[in-house]
């Protein structure tokens, strides 16, 4: 640190060291010139966040100061020795509530709402999606969390024209192994989306490491009192309509 600054570390429960002494996460600390702050790899969880009062003063690109590695937009990616300028300190000091990140328990249970192509899986495929514990693959990143397990059986073998994708969409490619799309998801995708993970659970999924377990729990739609699998059948488009057709 080259000048006085307030900072905080949040996200995964990492160990914070200030000049070699252990400090806590999720609270503001005042750093003086010459202080050294270290964030140690957390025992659970994947991502920790360092915030400084005044923000990081780098040029804004399309309204953001983050780096998008896929599109090569934003500031130069961080490297050892990179100096980050801090912006002006805003006034007054904000008063906000404290929301701690809960510990990551594995297997992590997340809710799953029926997707527009849920009925492209067989009944056994729908059950298997929620009955087994999936393992997070090493191929996971901010684009999506790839899961390993027993492949899901698809009822419809045809492929789709590209359809819109959102964060949390659960897509099943020809391998039968699902993918949960993350914040760097593409705009469209050509494989059936059989379910959608709600936004609050997406934040929990983002803390999973390769090798961690995950289990889905079907959630019935608010408009029906049916059991989850019945809700899935009624929500998905009929496969008899064929890809690209609109539901009646």
Model-derived regions, located:
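Conserved "landmark" site that anchors the functional core of diverse proteins
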Residues: 1-248
